[in-house]
Protein backbone atom coordinates (compact mmCIF):
# COMPACT_ATOMS: atom_id res chain seq x y z
CA UNK A 1 0.00 0.00 0.00
CA UNK A 2 2.87 2.38 0.46
CA UNK A 3 6.47 2.41 -0.69
CA UNK A 4 9.11 0.64 1.37
CA UNK A 5 11.08 2.62 3.93
CA UNK A 6 14.33 0.92 2.89
CA UNK A 7 15.95 4.21 1.93
CA UNK A 8 15.55 5.43 5.49
CA UNK A 9 16.45 2.17 7.18
CA UNK A 10 19.41 1.29 4.94
CA UNK A 11 19.12 -2.43 5.56
CA UNK A 12 16.11 -4.59 6.27
CA UNK A 13 16.42 -8.21 7.36
CA UNK A 14 13.52 -10.45 8.23
CA UNK A 15 14.56 -13.61 10.05
CA UNK A 16 12.41 -16.53 11.05
CA UNK A 17 14.43 -19.01 13.09
CA UNK A 18 12.61 -22.13 14.16
CA UNK A 19 13.72 -25.56 15.37
CA UNK A 20 13.52 -27.26 11.98
CA UNK A 21 13.88 -24.28 9.65
CA UNK A 22 15.84 -21.12 9.06
CA UNK A 23 14.29 -18.65 6.64
CA UNK A 24 15.82 -15.28 5.94
CA UNK A 25 15.04 -12.56 3.45
CA UNK A 26 17.75 -9.94 3.00
CA UNK A 27 17.12 -6.77 1.04
CA UNK A 28 19.67 -4.51 -0.63
CA UNK A 29 21.49 -1.85 1.31
CA UNK A 30 23.97 -4.06 3.17
CA UNK A 31 27.35 -2.53 4.02
CA UNK A 32 30.65 -4.42 3.69
CA UNK A 33 31.38 -6.65 6.66
CA UNK A 34 34.42 -4.56 7.61
CA UNK A 35 32.13 -1.63 8.45
CA UNK A 36 30.56 -3.54 11.32
CA UNK A 37 31.96 -4.55 14.67
CA UNK A 38 31.58 -8.19 15.65
CA UNK A 39 28.85 -8.95 18.16
CA UNK A 40 28.22 -12.31 19.78
CA UNK A 41 24.47 -12.47 20.33
CA UNK A 42 23.05 -15.85 21.22
CA UNK A 43 19.30 -16.41 21.40
CA UNK A 44 18.02 -19.90 22.11
CA UNK A 45 14.53 -21.36 22.15
CA UNK A 46 13.80 -25.03 22.41
CA UNK A 47 10.42 -24.88 20.65
CA UNK A 48 10.82 -22.19 18.00
CA UNK A 49 10.37 -18.49 17.38
CA UNK A 50 8.78 -16.17 14.84
CA UNK A 51 10.00 -12.71 13.92
CA UNK A 52 8.33 -10.22 11.58
CA UNK A 53 7.57 -6.51 11.36
CA UNK A 54 4.21 -7.02 13.07
CA UNK A 55 3.65 -8.38 16.55
CA UNK A 56 0.17 -9.57 15.57
CA UNK A 57 1.46 -11.43 12.52
CA UNK A 58 4.25 -13.03 14.55
CA UNK A 59 1.75 -14.12 17.19
CA UNK A 60 -0.33 -15.79 14.46
CA UNK A 61 2.69 -17.89 13.50
CA UNK A 62 3.47 -18.72 17.13
CA UNK A 63 -0.13 -19.79 17.74
CA UNK A 64 0.00 -22.16 14.77
CA UNK A 65 3.15 -23.79 16.17
CA UNK A 66 1.59 -24.11 19.63
CA UNK A 67 -1.25 -26.02 17.97
CA UNK A 68 1.19 -28.50 16.48
CA UNK A 69 2.11 -26.82 13.22
CA UNK A 70 5.58 -26.75 11.76
CA UNK A 71 7.69 -23.78 10.69
CA UNK A 72 6.23 -23.71 7.19
CA UNK A 73 2.68 -23.54 8.56
CA UNK A 74 3.86 -20.60 10.67
CA UNK A 75 5.43 -18.88 7.67
CA UNK A 76 2.16 -18.95 5.74
CA UNK A 77 0.04 -17.77 8.67
CA UNK A 78 2.48 -14.96 9.40
CA UNK A 79 2.76 -14.02 5.72
CA UNK A 80 -0.97 -13.64 5.18
CA UNK A 81 -1.35 -11.78 8.49
CA UNK A 82 1.39 -9.33 7.43
CA UNK A 83 -0.72 -8.50 4.37
CA UNK A 84 -3.23 -6.97 6.77
CA UNK A 85 -1.16 -5.69 9.67
CA UNK A 86 2.04 -4.55 7.90
CA UNK A 87 1.30 -4.24 4.16
CA UNK A 88 4.54 -2.45 3.31
CA UNK A 89 6.40 -5.60 4.36
CA UNK A 90 4.02 -8.30 3.18
CA UNK A 91 1.04 -8.14 0.85
CA UNK A 92 -0.91 -10.34 -1.55
CA UNK A 93 -0.53 -7.81 -4.35
CA UNK A 94 3.23 -8.34 -4.48
CA UNK A 95 5.63 -11.25 -4.24
CA UNK A 96 8.65 -12.62 -2.45
CA UNK A 97 11.25 -15.33 -1.95
CA UNK A 98 11.74 -18.12 0.54
CA UNK A 99 15.13 -19.47 1.59
CA UNK A 100 14.76 -22.42 3.94
CA UNK A 101 16.56 -25.44 5.34
CA UNK A 102 14.54 -28.39 6.57
CA UNK A 103 15.54 -30.64 9.46
CA UNK A 104 16.53 -33.21 6.82
CA UNK A 105 19.14 -30.78 5.52
CA UNK A 106 17.34 -29.85 2.30
CA UNK A 107 17.91 -26.24 1.24
CA UNK A 108 14.89 -24.76 -0.54
CA UNK A 109 14.70 -21.52 -2.51
CA UNK A 110 11.29 -20.57 -3.84
CA UNK A 111 10.74 -17.62 -6.18
CA UNK A 112 7.26 -16.12 -6.03
CA UNK A 113 8.13 -12.60 -7.09
CA UNK A 114 5.92 -10.61 -9.43
CA UNK A 115 6.21 -11.26 -13.16
CA UNK A 116 5.93 -8.83 -16.05
CA UNK A 117 2.51 -8.90 -17.74
CA UNK A 118 2.37 -10.37 -21.25
CA UNK A 119 1.50 -6.95 -22.67
CA UNK A 120 4.67 -5.31 -21.28
CA UNK A 121 6.76 -3.42 -23.83
CA UNK A 122 10.18 -1.82 -23.94
CA UNK A 123 9.18 1.84 -23.80
CA UNK A 124 6.32 1.61 -21.31
CA UNK A 125 8.12 3.76 -18.72
CA UNK A 126 9.05 6.57 -21.12
CA UNK A 127 7.07 9.80 -21.29
CA UNK A 128 5.81 11.48 -24.46
CA UNK A 129 9.25 12.99 -25.03
CA UNK A 130 11.02 9.64 -24.75
CA UNK A 131 12.48 10.26 -21.29
CA UNK A 132 12.36 7.89 -18.33
CA UNK A 133 9.42 8.68 -16.06
CA UNK A 134 9.77 7.82 -12.39
CA UNK A 135 6.02 8.12 -11.89
CA UNK A 136 5.30 5.66 -14.70
CA UNK A 137 7.91 3.22 -13.40
CA UNK A 138 6.92 3.35 -9.73
CA UNK A 139 3.42 4.73 -9.30
CA UNK A 140 1.41 3.95 -12.43
CA UNK A 141 -0.77 0.91 -13.05
CA UNK A 142 1.71 -0.04 -15.78
CA UNK A 143 4.32 -0.64 -13.10
CA UNK A 144 2.23 -3.38 -11.48
CA UNK A 145 3.57 -6.90 -11.93
CA UNK A 146 1.51 -10.09 -11.83
CA UNK A 147 1.32 -10.81 -8.06
CA UNK A 148 2.87 -14.00 -6.72
CA UNK A 149 2.39 -13.94 -2.95
CA UNK A 150 -0.82 -15.97 -2.89
CA UNK A 151 0.56 -18.72 -5.11
CA UNK A 152 3.85 -18.72 -3.22
CA UNK A 153 2.36 -19.04 0.25
CA UNK A 154 -0.09 -21.72 -0.86
CA UNK A 155 2.77 -23.62 -2.54
CA UNK A 156 4.75 -23.54 0.72
CA UNK A 157 1.77 -24.85 2.68
CA UNK A 158 1.04 -27.62 0.16
CA UNK A 159 4.61 -28.80 -0.30
CA UNK A 160 6.12 -28.39 3.17
CA UNK A 161 3.30 -27.76 5.64
CA UNK A 162 2.53 -30.28 8.36
CA UNK A 163 -0.80 -31.21 6.81
CA UNK A 164 -2.54 -30.50 10.12
CA UNK A 165 -4.14 -27.25 8.99
CA UNK A 166 -6.44 -26.30 6.15
CA UNK A 167 -5.83 -23.09 4.23
CA UNK A 168 -8.93 -21.61 5.87
CA UNK A 169 -7.47 -22.28 9.34
CA UNK A 170 -4.18 -20.66 8.36
CA UNK A 171 -5.98 -17.62 6.93
CA UNK A 172 -8.33 -17.19 9.89
CA UNK A 173 -5.86 -14.87 11.67
CA UNK A 174 -5.53 -12.49 8.72
CA UNK A 175 -9.28 -12.51 8.12
CA UNK A 176 -9.94 -11.67 11.77
CA UNK A 177 -7.48 -8.75 11.72
CA UNK A 178 -9.08 -7.35 8.56
CA UNK A 179 -12.72 -7.90 9.47
CA UNK A 180 -12.67 -6.92 13.13
CA UNK A 181 -9.83 -4.43 13.02
CA UNK A 182 -6.34 -4.27 14.49
CA UNK A 183 -4.23 -1.66 16.20
CA UNK A 184 -1.51 -0.26 13.95
CA UNK A 185 2.10 0.00 15.06
CA UNK A 186 4.29 3.10 15.04
CA UNK A 187 5.83 2.30 11.65
CA UNK A 188 2.43 1.85 9.99
CA UNK A 189 1.15 5.10 11.50
CA UNK A 190 4.14 6.92 10.04
CA UNK A 191 3.67 5.30 6.62
CA UNK A 192 -0.04 6.08 6.44
CA UNK A 193 0.67 9.76 7.07
CA UNK A 194 3.80 9.90 4.91
CA UNK A 195 2.03 8.59 1.80
CA UNK A 196 -1.24 10.38 2.39
CA UNK A 197 -0.96 12.15 -0.97
CA UNK A 198 -0.94 8.80 -2.78
CA UNK A 199 -3.91 7.36 -0.90
CA UNK A 200 -5.94 10.44 -1.82
CA UNK A 201 -5.59 9.55 -5.50
CA UNK A 202 -7.88 6.55 -5.04
CA UNK A 203 -11.39 6.59 -3.56
CA UNK A 204 -11.08 3.14 -2.02
CA UNK A 205 -7.77 3.96 -0.35
CA UNK A 206 -9.09 7.32 0.84
CA UNK A 207 -12.03 5.62 2.54
CA UNK A 208 -9.81 3.32 4.60
CA UNK A 209 -6.40 4.92 4.94
CA UNK A 210 -7.29 8.60 5.35
CA UNK A 211 -8.39 8.97 8.94
CA UNK A 212 -10.15 12.30 8.47
CA UNK A 213 -10.58 13.97 5.07
CA UNK A 214 -10.42 17.62 6.12
CA UNK A 215 -11.22 20.86 4.32
CA UNK A 216 -7.50 21.67 4.44
CA UNK A 217 -6.73 18.50 2.48
CA UNK A 218 -9.43 19.29 -0.05
CA UNK A 219 -8.03 22.80 -0.51
CA UNK A 220 -4.50 21.48 -0.99
CA UNK A 221 -5.75 19.09 -3.66
CA UNK A 222 -7.46 21.94 -5.47
CA UNK A 223 -4.36 24.13 -5.19
CA UNK A 224 -2.04 21.56 -6.77
CA UNK A 225 -4.55 20.80 -9.54
CA UNK A 226 -4.89 24.51 -10.30
CA UNK A 227 -1.12 24.99 -10.26
CA UNK A 228 -1.28 27.37 -7.30
CA UNK A 229 1.37 25.38 -5.44
CA UNK A 230 4.11 23.08 -6.81
CA UNK A 231 3.68 19.33 -6.42
CA UNK A 232 6.48 18.90 -3.87
CA UNK A 233 5.03 21.62 -1.65
CA UNK A 234 1.67 19.85 -1.85
CA UNK A 235 3.25 16.55 -0.82
CA UNK A 236 5.18 18.14 2.05
CA UNK A 237 2.09 19.90 3.40
CA UNK A 238 0.04 16.70 3.20
CA UNK A 239 2.73 14.83 5.10
CA UNK A 240 2.76 17.48 7.82
CA UNK A 241 -0.90 16.80 8.61
CA UNK A 242 -0.33 14.01 11.12
CA UNK A 243 -3.44 11.93 11.73
CA UNK A 244 -2.49 8.38 12.60
CA UNK A 245 -1.10 7.23 15.94
CA UNK A 246 0.20 3.94 17.25
CA UNK A 247 -2.73 1.86 18.47
CA UNK A 248 -5.33 3.39 16.15
CA UNK A 249 -7.74 0.77 14.79
CA UNK A 250 -8.10 0.00 11.08
CA UNK A 251 -11.00 -2.14 9.84
CA UNK A 252 -10.87 -3.48 6.27
CA UNK A 253 -14.10 -5.32 5.44
CA UNK A 254 -13.39 -5.56 1.69
CA UNK A 255 -9.93 -6.93 2.43
CA UNK A 256 -11.51 -9.60 4.63
CA UNK A 257 -13.84 -10.62 1.80
CA UNK A 258 -10.87 -11.00 -0.56
CA UNK A 259 -9.09 -13.21 1.96
CA UNK A 260 -12.25 -15.27 2.46
CA UNK A 261 -12.38 -16.01 -1.27
CA UNK A 262 -8.81 -17.29 -1.08
CA UNK A 263 -9.67 -19.25 2.07
CA UNK A 264 -12.59 -20.97 0.35
CA UNK A 265 -11.19 -21.44 -3.15
CA UNK A 266 -7.41 -21.43 -2.81
CA UNK A 267 -5.54 -20.02 -5.81
CA UNK A 268 -8.77 -19.72 -7.78
CA UNK A 269 -10.06 -17.34 -5.11
CA UNK A 270 -7.41 -14.86 -6.23
CA UNK A 271 -6.21 -15.69 -9.74
CA UNK A 272 -9.71 -16.17 -11.17
CA UNK A 273 -13.28 -15.29 -10.26
CA UNK A 274 -14.31 -12.06 -8.56
CA UNK A 275 -10.88 -11.00 -7.30
CA UNK A 276 -9.28 -11.50 -10.71
CA UNK A 277 -12.12 -9.55 -12.33
CA UNK A 278 -11.58 -6.66 -9.91
CA UNK A 279 -7.84 -6.61 -10.66
CA UNK A 280 -8.26 -6.74 -14.43
CA UNK A 281 -11.04 -4.13 -14.45
CA UNK A 282 -8.84 -1.79 -12.39
CA UNK A 283 -6.01 -2.31 -14.87
CA UNK A 284 -8.19 -1.66 -17.91
CA UNK A 285 -9.60 1.53 -16.40
CA UNK A 286 -6.14 2.95 -15.66
CA UNK A 287 -3.89 1.86 -18.54
CA UNK A 288 -2.58 -1.14 -16.62
CA UNK A 289 -1.34 -4.29 -18.35
CA UNK A 290 -2.30 -7.29 -16.20
CA UNK A 291 -4.77 -9.61 -17.95
CA UNK A 292 -6.88 -12.59 -16.91
CA UNK A 293 -4.45 -14.84 -18.77
CA UNK A 294 -1.49 -13.40 -16.83
CA UNK A 295 -3.21 -14.23 -13.55
CA UNK A 296 -4.23 -17.74 -14.60
CA UNK A 297 -0.71 -18.60 -15.78
CA UNK A 298 1.17 -17.46 -12.67
CA UNK A 299 3.26 -20.18 -11.01
CA UNK A 300 5.95 -20.00 -8.34
CA UNK A 301 9.34 -21.48 -9.26
CA UNK A 302 11.74 -23.55 -7.19
CA UNK A 303 15.28 -22.44 -8.07
CA UNK A 304 18.74 -23.74 -7.25
CA UNK A 305 20.23 -21.97 -4.23
CA UNK A 306 23.54 -20.18 -4.67
CA UNK A 307 26.47 -20.93 -2.40
CA UNK A 308 29.04 -18.58 -0.88
CA UNK A 309 31.50 -18.58 2.00
CA UNK A 310 31.78 -16.17 4.91
CA UNK A 311 34.46 -16.52 7.60
CA UNK A 312 34.57 -20.27 7.10
CA UNK A 313 30.82 -20.75 6.97
CA UNK A 314 28.91 -21.92 3.91
CA UNK A 315 26.13 -19.46 3.09
CA UNK A 316 23.23 -20.49 0.87
CA UNK A 317 21.01 -17.80 -0.57
CA UNK A 318 18.43 -17.01 -3.22
CA UNK A 319 19.70 -16.69 -6.78
CA UNK A 320 18.42 -14.34 -9.49
CA UNK A 321 16.14 -12.47 -9.71
CA UNK A 322 16.80 -11.74 -6.03
CA UNK A 323 19.70 -9.74 -4.61
CA UNK A 324 21.03 -12.85 -2.87
CA UNK A 325 23.75 -13.35 -5.50
CA UNK A 326 25.26 -9.85 -5.25
CA UNK A 327 24.99 -10.05 -1.46
CA UNK A 328 27.16 -13.18 -1.36
Predicted regions and their residues:
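C-terminal motif of bacterial Sec signal peptides marking the signal peptidase cleavage site
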Residues: 28-29
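Small/polar-residue-rich segments within soluble enzyme cores
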Residues: 326-328
